Design a protein with these regions (language model features):
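Exported/periplasmic ABC-transporter solute-binding proteins
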Residues: 1-168
């Protein structure tokens, strides 16, 4: 594993929220919390933007205990693709959803910290590992590329694109 792609929770800018606890996120996605003022934000109805089952949702279910068996509110809007979720974040004033941090960086949507931890931190609990699978014998070009991935210039590129380099 050379990097992680964090799965970030994103909100529309009008919510007034910049940090949520794991429990608050579960309460929001289950429908127990329905207004942003209940979690320190503005008096605005929450619009849950969910995703169909897939790697992002599996990562959340695996790493947030309260999300493991959670039934998403029936009022949720489902977005098939990241682009749909980005559009929802910009269209619906009270929206919340989740997506890879690389998409957050690419589209400039608002990510919240999770229990005070930003998605860019190595301690952030939600992420998908990235690695390489290769044959035992490497060509000189492949060896050079794998060596480059471990350098600081490559790590800078990873950070700028919403990936978190993993230190061995």
């Amino acid at each position: 594993e050379f990097a992680r792609v964090p799965v970030a929770f994103v909100v529309s800018r009008e919510t007034g929220v910049r940090d949520l606890s794991q429990q608050q996120i579960c309460d929001i996605f289950s429908g127990r919390v329905t207004n942003w003022k209940e979690v320190g934000g503005h008096d605005l109805l929450i619009d849950v933007q969910a995703r169909p089952d897939g790697s992002n949702l599996q990562t959340i279910r695996k790493n947030l205990r309260c999300f493991a068996e959670l039934q998403v509110t029936p009022k949720a809007h489902f977005n098939e693709h990241n682009a749909d979720l980005v559009a929802s974040m910009k269209t619906f004033r009270g929206a919340i959803g989740f997506m890879p941090l690389s998409e957050v960086v690419l589209h400039g949507v608002q990510a919240v910290t999770l229990d005070g931890t930003p998605a860019t931190a190595s301690a952030y609990p939600l992420g998908i590992g990235l690695g390489f699978v290769h044959r035992d014998e490497l060509s000189p070009g492949t060896r050079a590329f794998l060596d480059y991935v471990e350098t600081e210039p490559a790590r800078d590129i990873m950070r700028k694109t919403g990936h978190v380099p993993v230190t061995k």
